């Protein structure tokens, strides 16, 4: 054993050119393992250039000089340098000691991108797929939106007094769907759509949405809002700002009311037919339908004499029907009412039940004021 240690000591001195005491220190620290001792020496400040390490057994090493048939091994063959970009993607690397001739490399978890880097990736991906940077334009108070050109009919005036005017029909505009304009605001800790709530960058449920933006695609949830129409998406950079939810714009009351003094409350519908149709369309679009799950049609007979038919999933709850009625008839929000079945005539008291649990598939529901 003593002779092997002397051989290792002489070989360490021959390879590194250091003093014998310093060589003994590194060998003792490495348990007299020549390979580990050399690695520790160069990590401690030794030259990182190519070094010659004998691979022969200690008994075959001549005293004083390195053997002539050594195999050349570089220090970089012992510890592999990693590219900076690869380290960022794969995580930090650690080396754990093993047996005398082995070791283990441990790769840490991938480093998460900071919100600033994530926003950079989103804008970079959008620009690579055709997005154009524009200056933000803010409307002054009282400024209206761009007027739409008139597309109706009219009368062509006669050229002479005795010539009658002729009616000319206008061209009917074709609408294949509902065009939607959405503003995506990228904040310090998350993003928001228009004046909606903050959605975290780290939330797994938002990963598909952000990946679609990075690929220059319109996310599926925005395409569903358009119902086949065009989606115009604007991206605003607020990465240095904390999210502040804007105050909702004031809207004058245009709903329905009740006549006071009558024994049974009578709902008065003060909205115009166009406004009522718009409310019903908004209420219908607020019900998210999963086409992969079974669906059913529910007929609702309202207290004001109206009738609504809406598609639901079997997993929707009775409370979803109540919300649908309030959205379709905003005046009902201030009205106390219950939902009942027609036959048998029974009140649906537990509104947490699903439509399937309450046996309401393809059923007729009646609204009764209380």
UniProtKB/Swiss-Prot annotation:
Q: Which organism is it from?
A: Mus musculus
Span(s) of short sequence motif Nuclear localization signal = 109-115, 172-175
Limits of the SEP domain: 179-244
Q: Which family does it belong to?
A: Belongs to the NSFL1C family.
Function of this protein? Reduces the ATPase activity of VCP. Necessary for the fragmentation of Golgi stacks during mitosis and for VCP-mediated reassembly of Golgi stacks after mitosis. May play a role in VCP-mediated formation of transitional endoplasmic reticulum (tER). Inhibits the activity of CTSL (in vitro). Together with UBXN2B/p37, regulates the centrosomal levels of kinase AURKA/Aurora A during mitotic progression by promoting AURKA removal from centrosomes in prophase. Also, regulates spindle orientation during mitosis.
Q: Which residues carry this modification: Phosphoserine?
A: 74, 102, 114, 140, 176, 192, 272
Region feature (Disordered): 54-73, 80-116, 138-157
Q: Where does it localize?
A: Nucleus; Golgi apparatus, Golgi stack; Chromosome; Cytoplasm, Cytoskeleton, Microtubule organizing center, Centrosome
Which GO molecular function annotations are given, in alphabetical order? Answer: lipid binding
Keyword Nucleus attached: yes
Q: What is this protein called?
A: NSFL1 cofactor p47
Matching entries from PANTHER family are given as: NSFL1 COFACTOR P47, UBX DOMAIN CONTAINING PROTEIN
Q: Which UniProt keywords apply?
A: Chromosome, Cytoplasm, Cytoskeleton, Golgi apparatus, Lipid-binding, Nucleus, Phosphoprotein
Assembly notes: Part of a ternary complex containing STX5A, NSFL1C and VCP. NSFL1C forms a homotrimer that binds to one end of a VCP homohexamer. The complex binds to membranes enriched in phosphatidylethanolamine-containing lipids and promotes Golgi membrane fusion. Interaction with VCIP135 leads to dissociation of the complex via ATP hydrolysis by VCP. Binds ubiquitin and mono-ubiquitinated proteins via its N-terminal UBA-like domain when bound to VCP.
Primary gene name: Nsfl1c
Q: Which GO terms describe its cellular component?
A: centrosome; chromosome; cytoplasm; Golgi stack; nucleus; VCP-NSFL1C complex
């Amino acid at each position: 054993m003593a002779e092997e240690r002397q051989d290792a000591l002489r070989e360490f001195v021959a390879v590194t050119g250091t003093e014998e005491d310093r060589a003994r220190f590194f060998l003792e620290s490495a348990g007299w393992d020549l390979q580990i001792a050399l690695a520790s020496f160069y990590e401690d400040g030794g030259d990182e250039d190519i070094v010659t390490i004998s691979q022969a057994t200690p008994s075959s090493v001549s005293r004083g000089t390195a053997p002539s048939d050594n195999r050349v091994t570089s220090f970089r063959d012992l510890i592999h340098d990693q590219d900076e970009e690869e380290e960022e993607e794969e995580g930090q690397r650690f080396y754990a000691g093993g047996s005398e001739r082995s070791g283990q490399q441990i790769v840490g978890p991938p480093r998460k991108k900071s919100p600033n880097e994530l926003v950079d990736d989103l804008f970079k991906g959008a620009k690579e797929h055709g997005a154009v940077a524009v200056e933000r334009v803010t409307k002054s108070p009282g400024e209206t939106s761009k007027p739409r050109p008139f597309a109706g009919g009219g009368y062509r005036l006669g050229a002479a007094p005795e010539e009658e005017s002729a009616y000319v029909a206008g061209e009917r505009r074709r609408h294949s769907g509902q065009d939607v304009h959405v503003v995506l605001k990228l904040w310090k800790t998350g993003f928001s759509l228009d004046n909606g709530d903050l959605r975290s960058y780290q939330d797994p449920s938002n990963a598909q949405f952000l990946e679609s933006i990075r690929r220059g695609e319109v996310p599926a949830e925005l395409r569903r809002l358009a119902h086949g129409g065009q989606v115009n998406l604007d991206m605003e950079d607020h990465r240095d700002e904390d999210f502040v939810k804007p105050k909702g714009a004031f809207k004058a009351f245009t709903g329905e009311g009740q006549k006071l003094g009558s024994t049974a409350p009578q709902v008065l519908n003060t909205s115009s037919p166009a406004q009522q149709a718009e409310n019903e369309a908004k209420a219908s679009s607020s019900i998210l339908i999963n086409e992969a799950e079974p669906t059913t049609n529910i007929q609702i007979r309202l207290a004001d004499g109206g009738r609504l038919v809406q598609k639901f999933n079997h997993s929707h709850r009775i409370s979803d029907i109540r919300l649908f009625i309030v959205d379709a008839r905003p005046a009902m929000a201030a009205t106390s009412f219950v939902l009942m079945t027609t036959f048998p005539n029974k009140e649906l008291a537990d509104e947490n039940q699903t439509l399937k649990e309450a046996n309401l598939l393809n059923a007729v529901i009646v609204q009764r004021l209380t």
